[in-house]
Curated annotation (Swiss-Prot):
Taxonomic lineage: Eukaryota, Amoebozoa, Evosea, Eumycetozoa, Dictyostelia
Keywords annotated in UniProt: Glycoprotein, Membrane, Signal, Transmembrane, Transmembrane helix
One matching Pfam family: PA14
Record-given protein name: Protein psiG
GO (cellular component) term, any one: extracellular region
Species, as recorded: Dictyostelium discoideum
Cytoplasmic side, ranges: 666-706
Annotated PA14 domain residues: 109-253
Extracellular side: 24-644
Domain of life: Eukaryota
Transmembrane spans: 645-665
Length: 706
C-alpha cells in the first residue's frame, strides 16, 4: 500500500507540472450598446417581420453601416420593418435625444477541445434596468424564458476591432434580430430584419484574405422586438482592440464622454469648438475641456466690394459682417500715390513718374529723369548735337553743338565733323558770303551758289530748331525771340516723333489685378485681370500687390482614410498611407482618427504548439517573425513515442493517476476523485469499468451509488 501511495504522490506531482500552454480561457470584448425606446423610434417593437437581406450597403463607410437606399418603399426596408430612415444612424451612434450609450463587456469562453471561443445566451438582456430603463416608467416590456419577466428588449450593439488572419478562421452566429458582420470593410454576413433566431456562418478562407495580414472586424447587432433575445457566437478569430479613445471606447470617436457644445464651449461665437482628437492621450484627472480645439471662423471677402473687410462679429453671434474699410498699402517706394478705392477693382494708384522729363521708371521711391544719354537715344544720337531735357519745352531737345563764333564776321561759318562731332569754322569767300541778303532776326546769311551771280537764300538761325519733333518751334521775326511749344497730347497719350501715341505706363493704377490700357483718345481703361489657368489642378486668385497666385486645388477628404487629390482638374480619392515606425509595429488608418499604431502579431507556423515572436530590424538584419515552441510543450506537441506511451497507460498521466486510484479504492475511489475534480477531464467524465452496460449482460464491478 505504501508503494502505491508513493506512486500516487509522484504521479499527481507530474500531473501538476505538465501545464498545457494555450490561448486565454476567456476573451473580453468591449462593446458599445445603444439603448432605444419604441416611443422615440417606431422601428423598435413594430409588427413582426422576418429576415431581410440587402437593407445596408455592402461596404462599411466609417464605423457604422449605411442604408442601401433613400427610398422608404425599398423592398428590404419593408420586409425588415424599417420605416424611419433618418433615424437609422442613431442605431449605432450616440445621440442624446434618441438613445443612451453604454459600454459593456462581452466575454467569450474558450472550448479547448476545438480552440473555438463562444458566447451563448438564450436570454441576452445586457442592459436591464439601465439606459432609458433607469426610469421605471419605461419598464413595460416582458418576455424571455420566463415569459412574464421584465427585460430591456430594445437596443443595438456594435464591436469595432481588428485581427491578424491566421488562415483557418470561421465565424458563426445565431440569434435575433438584425446582425451584420463586416470583414475588411466588406459585408460578409447579412441577417438583417426583424426575425426569430436565425443562423449564419462565415468561412474566412473563402474571402481571399492574406495570412498574417491585419483586417478589420466589425460586428453589428440589434434587438428590436419582444418576447425573445438570443445571441450565440462561435469563432476562432483572434480579434482585438487596436486603440481606444479617451473615453475607453474601442475605436471610439470620443462622443461617449465629450460633447462639443457642453464640454468645449469657450463662449466665443467666432470660434468653431470641437472635442479633442479621439486618440489623444489625456492624463487621468485632467478635464477634457483642457484639450478641446477652437478654430477661428474665417470670413470670405465679398465679391461685390473690394474696398471693405469682413470678419466674424461677436455682437451678431458669430456672423460674418463688414468690420471696416480696406486699408490700402503704401506704395511710395514704387513712386505710386493712392487715388482711392474702386469697389470693383480695389485700391487705385497713380504714378508719380509721369512728366515730360521723366522716364516713367521708379528706383527706390525716386523717379528716373531723362538725362542727356536718354534724350540722345530718343532723338537720334547726332554727335553734332547737344541733348538735354526741358520740361517747359515738352521734353528732350537737341541744340547745335557748334555755334557761330563771337566775332561779328558773318562770313565765318561754324562746322562740325559728322563722325566725331569736332567743331571748327569755315570762312566764306566774298562771293559765298556777300550776296546782298537782307535778314530779319530769325534768319542767317546764305548765298545760293548754284546760279551766277549768287542770290540770297536765307536760312533759319540755328536756335530755332531744338531737334525735338514734338515741339512747335517759332521765332519772332521782329524781336528774334524763339519759342518751343510742346505738342498737346491728351490724357495718357504722349508725343513720339511728332505724333501722339498711347503710353500704357501712363495708365498704371498700381493694381496688379488690372490690365491697364491707354486708348488713342487719351483715356485709361482698367480691365480686371483673368488669371490664365494653365494647370487645371491649381486654383488661381489675384492679389492686387503680387498679381495672380496659384494654389493647389483643394479636394475634400472623405473621412480620415480617403485623401482627396486632383487629377486633370477632377477631384478623386485615394487611400491614406500610414507608415509603420518599425517592423514589429503596424500602422493603419482608422476612419475615426486617421493613422494608428499597434503591435504586430506574428502568426506561428503551428499555432497549437508554437507562439509567434516578432524581432525588430537591426543595422545588419531585417525584421522578421519567428515561430517558437511553447515552454513547456503542450502534451499534443510531445514526440510520438511519449504520446503513445501515455495512450497505453490511459491517454494522459492524469488518467494513470485515476487508474491507480481505482485499483486502490475501487468504484468509490473513482467517484471521490471525480467529485473532487468536478469532472474536469472531459475524457474521463465516466469510467466504463464501473458503469452498468447499456446492452445485454451485467458488469460485476458496477456499484450503484448508495
Amino acid at each position: 500500500m505504501k508503494i502505491i501511495l508513493t506512486l500516487l504522490i509522484i504521479l499527481f506531482s507530474l500531473n501538476k507540472n505538465l501545464n498545457f500552454v494555450s490561448s486565454e480561457v476567456t476573451k473580453s470584448r468591449i462593446c458599445s450598446i445603444f439603448d432605444q425606446l419604441p416611443k422615440l423610434n417606431s422601428d423598435f417593437e413594430p409588427d413582426y417581420g422576418d429576415i431581410s437581406v440587402g437593407m445596408i450597403k455592402n461596404v462599411l463607410e466609417g464605423d457604422s453601416p449605411t442604408l442601401a437606399s433613400n427610398d422608404p418603399n425599398f423592398k428590404p426596408f419593408v420586409n425588415g420593418k424599417l420605416k424611419n430612415l433618418n433615424l437609422f444612424p442613431t442605431w449605432f451612434n450616440k445621440n442624446h435625444t434618441q438613445n443612451v450609450m453604454l459600454l459593456k463587456k462581452l466575454n467569450l469562453t474558450l472550448d479547448k477541445s476545438s480552440n473555438i471561443y463562444s458566447f451563448v445566451k438564450d436570454d441576452f438582456f445586457p442592459i436591464d434596468y439601465q439606459g432609458w430603463d433607469v426610469d421605471e416608467s419605461n419598464r413595460i416590456y416582458y418576455g424571455g424564458r420566463i415569459f412574464t419577466a421584465y427585460h430591456n428588449f430594445h437596443y443595438c450593439l456594435k464591436i469595432n476591432s481588428v485581427f491578424f488572419y491566421q488562415g483557418t478562421e470561421t465565424f458563426k452566429f445565431e440569434g435575433d434580430d438584425d446582425v451584420w458582420v463586416f470583414i475588411d470593410k466588406k459585408l460578409v454576413l447579412d441577417l438583417g430584419g426583424l426575425h426569430p433566431a436565425r443562423r449564419g456562418t462565415v468561412d474566412l478562407t473563402k474571402l481571399g484574405l492574406q495570412v498574417n495580414k491585419t483586417y478589420s472586424f466589425d460586428f453589428f447587432y440589434c434587438e428590436r422586438h419582444t418576447p425573445y433575445s438570443k445571441m450565440k457566437i462561435q469563432t476562432d478569430i483572434q480579434a482585438f482592440c487596436a486603440w481606444s479613445d479617451y473615453c475607453g471606447v474601442c475605436q471610439g470617436d470620443g462622443s461617449t464622454c465629450c460633447n462639443k457644445d457642453l464640454d468645449c464651449d469657450d463662449d466665443d461665437p467666432c470660434t468653431i469648438d470641437s472635442c479633442p482628437l479621439p486618440n489623444l492621450p489625456i492624463p487621468g484627472g485632467d478635464k477634457i475641456s483642457k484639450y478641446c480645439r477652437h478654430t477661428n471662423i474665417t470670413c470670405t471677402q465679398p465679391s461685390n466690394n473690394k474696398c471693405v473687410i469682413t470678419g466674424c462679429s461677436k455682437d451678431t453671434n458669430g456672423k460674418c459682417e463688414v468690420i471696416g474699410n480696406l486699408e490700402c498699402a503704401d506704395k511710395s517706394k514704387y513712386c505710386m500715390t493712392l487715388t482711392g478705392c474702386d469697389p470693383k477693382l480695389g485700391c487705385q494708384y497713380k504714378s508719380n513718374c509721369i512728366g515730360p522729363c521723366l522716364t516713367g521708371e521708379c528706383n527706390n521711391g525716386k523717379c528716373t529723369s531723362m538725362d542727356a544719354d536718354y534724350c540722345s537715344n530718343e532723338l537720334g544720337e547726332d554727335p553734332c548735337k547737344i541733348y538735354s531735357c526741358n520740361a517747359k519745352n515738352g521734353g528732350c531737345m537737341a541744340t547745335p553743338k557748334c555755334t557761330s563764333p563771337s566775332s561779328s564776321n558773318p562770313c565765318v561759318i561754324p562746322t562740325c565733323s559728322a563722325d566725331k562731332g569736332v567743331c571748327g569754322t569755315y570762312t566764306q569767300n566774298s562771293t559765298e558770303c556777300n550776296c546782298n541778303c537782307k535778314l530779319n532776326p530769325c534768319q542767317k546769311n546764305n548765298c545760293d551758289q548754284s546760279v551766277n551771280p549768287p542770290v540770297c537764300s536765307p536760312l533759319p538761325i540755328d536756335t530755332i530748331d531744338d531737334g525735338n519733333p514734338c515741339t512747335i518751334d517759332i521765332c519772332d521775326k521782329i524781336t528774334g525771340s524763339v519759342k518751343h511749344t510742346p505738342m498737346e497730347c491728351s490724357g495718357c497719350t504722349k508725343c513720339n516723333n511728332g505724333k501722339c501715341i498711347p503710353i500704357e505706363s501712363n495708365c498704371d493704377d498700381g493694381n496688379l489685378c488690372t490690365i491697364d490700357q491707354c486708348m488713342n483718345n487719351g483715356s485709361c481703361i482698367h480691365t480686371p485681370l483673368s488669371c490664365n489657368i494653365t494647370n487645371p489642378c491649381m486654383d488661381y486668385t489675384c492679389n492686387a500687390d503680387i498679381g495672380c497666385v496659384g494654389v493647389p486645388k483643394i479636394c475634400p477628404n472623405k473621412g480620415n482614410c480617403l485623401i482627396g487629390y486632383c487629377d486633370a482638374g477632377e477631384c478623386k480619392l485615394k487611400d491614406r498611407i500610414c507608415d509603420s515606425p518599425s517592423f514589429c509595429q503596424i500602422s493603419q488608418c482608422s476612419d475615426v482618427t486617421g493613422c494608428i499604431v499597434f503591435d504586430k502579431v506574428c502568426i506561428p507556423s503551428n499555432p497549437k504548439c508554437e507562439t509567434g515572436v516578432c524581432i525588430n530590424a537591426t543595422s545588419t538584419e531585417p525584421g522578421r517573425c519567428e515561430s517558437v515552441d511553447f515552454d513547456p510543450k503542450p502534451f499534443v506537441c510531445k514526440p510520438a513515442a511519449i504520446i503513445s506511451t501515455s495512450v497505453i497507460v490511459g491517454v494522459s498521466v492524469a488518467a494513470a493517476v485515476v487508474a491507480i486510484a481505482i485499483v486502490v479504492a475501487s468504484k468509490k475511489g473513482y467517484d471521490a476523485w471525480a467529485a473532487s475534480n468536478n469532472n474536469s477531464l472531459a475524457s474521463l467524465t465516466s469510467n466504463p469499468l464501473y458503469e452498468n452496460p447499456t446492452g445485454n449482460g451485467d458488469n460485476p464491478m458496477y456499484q450503484p451509488n448508495s
